[in-house]
């Protein structure tokens, strides 16, 4: 890349930094005063004219400065050399807060709340996907001789509790045999495979336990084939309203803040944005129209996968106006995802 291109990028970087900080269009005079660009005001004006002609910046009003476009933000993000690191104290605080979660639900809720606070954006996390989870343990508890409580625990921390009404009563010995049959069919299997295994138990069960096995298997299959990946935890929605000015005046897109809020209520839209993020350790940035969601034209989505022991369990990230602190937000998303995975791996 030529020195001219490098200089023009520095001008673009300065425009992005000032606009993110002030929310005001940026002029050449302000750039020269605030940044050590090492060139004259005339050169900066010429560079800004070039950036505008190439679509990296735009003039929102006749007599104002310039603001970055989606293309400009993309160029800026693609050339971020160093993501702003979190301090040791911040990393320790994140881990301590997440480790205090009592179960999967609590850890994910804490993660979303934390990410929303760190980034001042809307944070979202997807529950562990069905295909990624395995059965860690099945507990069978007799509530009465004719009623059982099944507690299914996955390696991702998901816990499901279901009641089984029996046709016949079971004594302690029969209960232990049933527990062994069900546990043997399920333990360690991915949920899809576990569903098949438990559905085949009826043909193999001893005659005196067949009714209890069939009833238990029916409940378990229903549990195993549900889709927890359709569940989302959302936090920080109020941050959108605090940034309401960023969603006004988007050409051809009136009422955009309302449209974004409505899109957030449609979980399928958010799930679509997280669907391509099933890679822990890699942060994806979608800016404006790159989201390919009409209601999200004025937003950016920064997302990644989280997981444990090399397995990606789900996606998570933040959503906010395109005018955001990209280096800081990328660092926060990566850190919270990494520590959620670490906490889940230890359980």
Swiss-Prot record:
- Please name the NCBIfam families in this protein's record: hrcA
**Record flagged with keyword DNA-binding:** no
Please identify the protein, giving its name as recorded: Heat-inducible transcription repressor HrcA
Q: Does the keyword Ribosomal protein apply?
A: no
Q: What does this protein do?
A: Negative regulator of class I heat shock genes (grpE-dnaK-dnaJ and groELS operons). Prevents heat-shock induction of these operons.
- Residue ranges of the TM segments: none
Q: Which GO terms describe its molecular function?
A: DNA binding
Organism the protein comes from = Rhodococcus opacus (strain B4)
Q: Which UniProt keywords apply?
A: Repressor, Stress response, Transcription, Transcription regulation
Q: Which Pfam families match?
A: HrcA
Tell me the Gene Ontology biological-process terms attached to this UniProt entry. negative regulation of DNA-templated transcription
Q: Which HAMAP family match?
A: HrcA
What InterPro entries would the database entry show? GAF-like_dom_sf, HrcA, HrcA_C, WH-like_DNA-bd_sf, WH_DNA-bd_sf, WHTH_transcript_rep_HrcA_IDD
């Amino acid at each position: 890349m030529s020195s001219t291109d490098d200089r023009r990028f520095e001008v673009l970087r300065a425009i992005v930094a000032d606009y993110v900080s002030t929310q005001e269009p940026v002029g050449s005079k302000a750039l020269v005063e605030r940044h050590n660009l090492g060139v004259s005001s005339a050169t900066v004006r010429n560079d800004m004219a070039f950036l505008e002609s190439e679509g990296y910046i735009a003039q929102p009003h006749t007599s104002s400065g310039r603001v970055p476009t989606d293309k400009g933000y993309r160029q800026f993000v693609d050339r971020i050399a160093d993501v702003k690191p979190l301090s040791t104290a911040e990393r320790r605080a994140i881990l301590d807060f997440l480790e205090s979660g009592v179960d999967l639900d609590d850890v994910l809720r804490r993660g979303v709340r934390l990410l929303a606070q760190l980034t001042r954006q809307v944070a979202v996390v997807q529950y562990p996907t069905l295909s990624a989870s395995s059965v860690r343990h099945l507990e069978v508890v007799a509530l009465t001789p004719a009623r059982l409580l099944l507690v299914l625990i996955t390696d991702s921390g998901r816990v499901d509790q279901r009641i089984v009404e029996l046709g016949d009563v079971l004594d302690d010995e029969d209960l232990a045999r049933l527990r062994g049959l069900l546990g043997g069919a399920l333990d360690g299997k991915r949920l899809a495979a576990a569903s098949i295994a438990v559905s085949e138990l009826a043909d193999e069960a001893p005659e005196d336990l067949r009714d209890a096995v069939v009833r238990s298997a029916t409940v378990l299959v229903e549990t195993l084939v549900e889709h927890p990946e359709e569940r989302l935890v959302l936090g920080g929605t109020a941050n959108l309203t605090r940034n309401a000015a960023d969603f006004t005046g988007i050409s051809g897109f009136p009422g955009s803040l309302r449209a974004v809020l409505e899109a957030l209520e449609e979980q399928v839209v958010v799930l679509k944005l997280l669907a391509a993020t099933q890679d822990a350790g890699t942060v994806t940035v979608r800016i404006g129209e790159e989201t390919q969601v009409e209601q999200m034209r004025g937003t950016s989505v920064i997302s990644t996968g989280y997981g444990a022991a090399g397995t990606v369990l789900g996606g998570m990230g933040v959503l906010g106006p395109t005018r955001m602190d990209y280096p800081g937000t990328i660092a926060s998303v990566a850190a919270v995802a990494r520590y959620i995975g670490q906490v889940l791996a230890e359980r």
